[in-house]
UniProtKB/Swiss-Prot annotation:
Catalytic reaction equation(s): acetaldehyde + NAD(+) + CoA = acetyl-CoA + NADH + H(+)
Protein name per UniProt: Acetaldehyde dehydrogenase 1
Binding annotation for NAD(+): 11-14, 161-169, 288
Pfam families found in the cross-reference section: AcetDehyd-dimer (PF09290), Semialdhyde_dh (PF01118)
Catalytic residues in the record: 129 (acyl-thioester intermediate)
Species assigned in the record: Novosphingobium aromaticivorans (strain ATCC 700278 / DSM 12444 / CCUG 56034 / CIP 105152 / NBRC 16084 / F199)
Length: 311
């Protein structure tokens, strides 16, 4: 069966790493064209070396290209501002969009958690790197619990892997991730913190997830977390638990007060993760960026499979 042709818009680090993943691990998609705005960018040069069509004239260059009419899926790795323009044009032309920017026009999407709900959406959003790493763990606790009252994530990433866009949008990162912890992860209230670690040599991404839940015991949570880690590892091999899940119980004799929510009885879980990148283009310590491109590719493969089945 013919694979679905795809385009990548944005030839920077994220777009180039995604390109290399699509070249190295082809499944349901065929990368047809890479779009940039700098004719001399490394990403476009690498695309040409691999025999992939390119344009340095942005979205308009893509729309004028003979391959455009064959594109079924487009990945946008530009900026939130540019994405709003791109989405309108691509949607009008019947192209499904996987959004790697903070624009969040489409629904938040984390492949092993809620991708099956969004296969027919014209636009899906990849949340944030911290969201892709930690929301599966919140969801793992939520699916075996009656309620997750609160979930907090702390994402620590190498300072070297945080470009100017990340640094300029720290507040947006925390707000978006916290909201997705609630909407996708299933927590009543979510909070997100990001730390830029200046250590040399650079540290790989590390994440800590805290949940306050009721209605499940430690063994249920432990098994659910292990199962979810295995699901994420299918597309991010470097995703793993740093140590066994830690638990603390709160009962009627030692209730925990949650600001704004009242007293809590149940289980506090602490899940510690690390994410090592595959090194397809970005260095392996950039697990925070790698998990975004890997999740985007996994999402695209599912969208493409849906299109192929309907053809």
């Amino acid at each position: 069966m013919t694979r679905v042709k795809a385009a990548i818009i944005g030839s920077g680090n994220i777009g180039t790493d995604l390109m290399m993943k699509m070249i190295k691990y082809p499944q349901n998609m065929e990368l047809a064209i890479v779009v940039g705005i700098d004719e001399k960018s490394e990403g476009l040069a690498m695309a040409r070396e691999h025999g992939i069509a390119t344009t340095h004239e942005g979205l308009e260059g893509l729309r004028r290209h003979p391959l455009y009419k064959e594109i079924g899926i487009a990945f946008d790795a530009t900026s939130a501002y540019a994405h709003k323009v791109h989405d309108e044009a691509l949607r009008a032309d019947g192209i499904q969009v996987v959004d790697l920017t903070p624009a969040a026009i489409g629904p938040f999407t984390v492949p092993p958690v809620n991708m099956s709900q969004h296969l027919d959406q014209p636009n899906v959003n990849m949340v944030t790197c911290g969201g892709q790493a930690t929301i599966p763990m919140v969801a793992a606790v939520a699916r075996v619990s009656d309620k997750v009252h609160y979930a907090e994530i702390v994402a620590s990433v190498s300072s070297r892997s945080a470009g100017p866009g990340t640094r300029a949008n720290i507040d947006e990162f925390t707000r978006t991730t916290a909201r997705a912890i609630e909407v996708v992860g299933g927590a009543t209230r979510g909070k997100a913190i990001i730390i830029l670690n200046p250590a040399e040599p650079p540290m790989i991404m590390r994440d800590t997830v805290f949940t306050l839940s009721e209605g499940a015991d430690e063994d249920q949570i432990r098994r659910s977390v292990a199962d979810m880690v295995a699901e994420v590892q299918k597309y991010v091999p470097g995703y793993r638990l740093k140590q066994e899940v830690q638990f603390e119980r709160f009962g009627d004799n030692n209730k925990l007060k949650i600001p704004g929510q009242g007293e809590f009885t149940g289980i506090k879980s602490m899940i510690m993760l690390e994410v090592e990148g595959a090194g397809d283009y970005l260095p392996s310590y950039s697990g925070n960026l790698d998990i975004m491109t890997a999740a985007a590719k996994a999402t695209g493969e599912l969208l493409a499979a849906r299109r192929m089945a309907a053809a």
